[in-house]
Amino acid sequence: METIVILGSTGSIGCNALQVIKLHQDKYKVFALTANGNVDLLTEQCSEFEPQFAFALNREANQQLKKNLLALNSKTIVLDDENSLDWLASHKETNTVISAIVGAAGLKPTMAAANSGKKILLANKETLVMAGELFVKAVKQSNATLIPIDSEHNAILQVLPRSKKLNYKSNGIRKILLTASGGPFRTSTKEELKHVTPKEALRHPNWIMGKKITIDSATMMNKGLEVIEACWLFDIPASEIEVVIHPQSIIHSLVEYVDGSTLAQLGNPDMRTPIAYALSHPERIESGVLGLDLIKTKRLDFEAPDLDKFPCLGLAYKALHIGKNAPTILNAANEVAVEAFLKESITFNQIAELIEFCMDAVEPQSLDSIETVLEVDSKTRHLALSWIDCHNLTS
């Protein structure tokens, strides 16, 4: 029986993971569930899956969770220490940690899991973006197992030879092709993007996701973060990662080999598929997802990304080229910018403007510890907030 901690169980990834686990309760036992503030859903999840521990990062939500579970006579223990996430991620009775917390908040507990040699199913791409070198080093030193949940990176893993490590050199890979839907504004003009509203940006054509990642998909920053993530996961330079727009989201990524072969993973756009493969890797288990109907699909289209219209993708490549703390700055500025856009404090196009400003303003420096990473993250956020104060649409 594999014991699992889900960091971020009330989000899209967490909910989908629990759906897959529910199909295989003979194989997987939920050891702990954590969330930020969605106490009602977390209460329901605890009632159904009966984890040994639960924790809500929001203090008021955590107190309410205690009351809710007490009223249900639940045996689940609600933790209240500020280090509870790290403690759960490194707990000796935990085999597997699903890292599904959105943003920089997931960095420390995911690092704790890596340092403890856990099997890490990684959905929190920010860990690799912010602290890729440190995280990969921790995984190797502790002999932890790292399996991506992101559909694109999971697809790459599926078409790599099983016997090889996640390394492009040893697999005869020429390049990786990361597919992107193009988001809701793929056919919009640059002029039209000036007037985009949060409501419009949250209408993703293919995927049902959380707000932050949906906005990232609309700006194509999500794909930029995935390029950075792929560099660390597969030890491949950015020059050998190509982004291809594929509106149908049926092909989740492709790998081109040196012999001229190109292998792709296809499937309906449903996160339960990569989650199921991550859980059972290298074997396969039922996910609850229907098979792909190629006749109904009819066609698969591809096009190059427009970097002029979607500059966030280019900024991610720029961060990789600069190296050092640049990806950390990129990520922090983007998180602040997305939140500001959702509050209608800045425009859609100002998201990229803010990120570029921060990347130019913060001095390059090496990252030798998680503390240094967090310092850069904090400094960038303060700078970004100051920029917003000067450009705030609501002020």
Regions from the language model: what does each represent?
Residues M1-S395:
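Catalytic, metal-anchored helix/loop core of enzyme active sites in primary metabolism
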